[in-house]
Amino acid sequence: MDHSMSKKLHDEALLHIVGGVNSPSRSNKGVGGGIPVTMERANGAYFYDVDGNKYIDYLAAFGPIITGHAHPHITEAITKAAQNGVLYGTPTKHEITFAKMLKEAIPSLEKVRFTNSGTEAVMTTIRVARAYTGRDKIIKFAGCYHGHFDLVLVEAGSGPSTLGIPDSAGVTKSTAEEVITVPFNDLASFKEALATWGNQVAAVLVEPIVGNFGMVEPAEGFLEAINELAHENGSLVIYDEVITAFRFMYGGAQNYLGVIPDLTAMGKIIGGGLPIGAYGGRIDIMEKVAPLGPAYQAGTHAGNPASILSGIACLEVLQEEGLYDRFQKYGSMLKDGIEKAAVKHGIAVTVNQIVGALTVYFTDEPVTNYAEAGATNGDLFGRFFKGMLEEGINLAPSKYEAWFITSAHSEADILETIQAVDTVFAKMVQDK
């Protein structure tokens, strides 16, 4: 494929934008470098770049675009918002409609508040949990990404009962010491952390199904045990459902798994492609939020009509009968096709697939936590990513990210993708 215009534009972007991208995940650092492709437009399941190349897209903007690009129902809603004014700074009736839709889909959301992003939603749930419990520390799980605010840019110390250390320049040591990081799916380490720091722990922050070191399900009984132990300790449980809400069913991963948190943070899908976040939970906890309580959260753009109307339209599309069954069918087809191609060419892969989301790890070992994900072969993934791009398949440029199937993908797209995998695996073996 010709990528000359993408290269020209990236060179120009480097002169004006830090690193040439507005989010580091858009660079190709995670796949060994190279020029990120600059896209011109998108429609349905397809991307079209500035050089005129067409791709089947599984990036889906890192998750939000579950209905495909430029879905007509969502486009109509956004157009209506633009015609009527995109920002008021006042309440609107649409906020009420959307809040009711979220509550009906995810019953643990007894009260809801809108924010501008998933990062803001998670950040505020922690603040609210601290206000409710009068405690300061949180427990999080290694490799789970919860946004780019200081408190969650923390990695594990030397063991499960040690305090965290900064995972980014600019995060202070004192901030990191408010966080205890333990391995996902490791109940013994979680118990040890609670035993050490329990009376200081305001909340346990967890992705109920991990989406940030690939798609990883909780071990049987893991989330139930977290709930029980946290509540015995007087701590709250916060689910970060920024990736998982409405991903596996019409509702949250908590509905899908049957385990209920105290607070939930959401983003991505619920905006239909526009910036949004939301959080909610038990009434007694949510009433700690201003103007009813002492925990402050505000935002000029929070609840803006464009994002709210886009979100309403997205959820309306997701109520289509049989849609999640189709996600499951296509997800299973992809997993099966990739695994068969890997066996055919003697390439070790593990595919974690949950409904319409999957991750291809280059390893013959199961992946159940961040350490295991980190041990997979990143060099092979980089070659695979670049090979798939040349075959017209757009993936996220990181071995830790998921593929997302949208309502716009067809069976023909899935079969074409499987053929591309076969072709790329063959080239990878040939070019050893």
From Swiss-Prot:
PANTHER family: GLUTAMATE-1-SEMIALDEHYDE 2,1-AMINOMUTASE, GLUTAMATE-1-SEMIALDEHYDE 2,1-AMINOMUTASE 2. GO terms for biological process: protoporphyrinogen IX biosynthetic process. This is Glutamate-1-semialdehyde 2,1-aminomutase 2. It is found in: Cytoplasm. Its cofactor is pyridoxal 5'-phosphate. GO terms for molecular function: glutamate-1-semialdehyde 2,1-aminomutase activity; pyridoxal phosphate binding; transaminase activity. It comes from the Bacteria. Pathway: Porphyrin-containing compound metabolism; protoporphyrin-IX biosynthesis; 5-aminolevulinate from L-glutamyl-tRNA(Glu): step 2/2. Coiled coil: none annotated. Belongs to the class-III pyridoxal-phosphate-dependent aminotransferase family. HemL subfamily. It comes from Listeria welshimeri serovar 6b (strain ATCC 35897 / DSM 20650 / CCUG 15529 / CIP 8149 / NCTC 11857 / SLCC 5334 / V8). PROSITE patterns: AA_TRANSFER_CLASS_3. Homodimer. GO terms for cellular component: cytoplasm. The modification N6-(pyridoxal phosphate)lysine is found at residue 268. It holds the Pfam family Aminotran_3. It catalyses: (S)-4-amino-5-oxopentanoate = 5-aminolevulinate. Its EC number is 5.4.3.8. Keywords: Cytoplasm, Isomerase, Porphyrin biosynthesis, Pyridoxal phosphate.
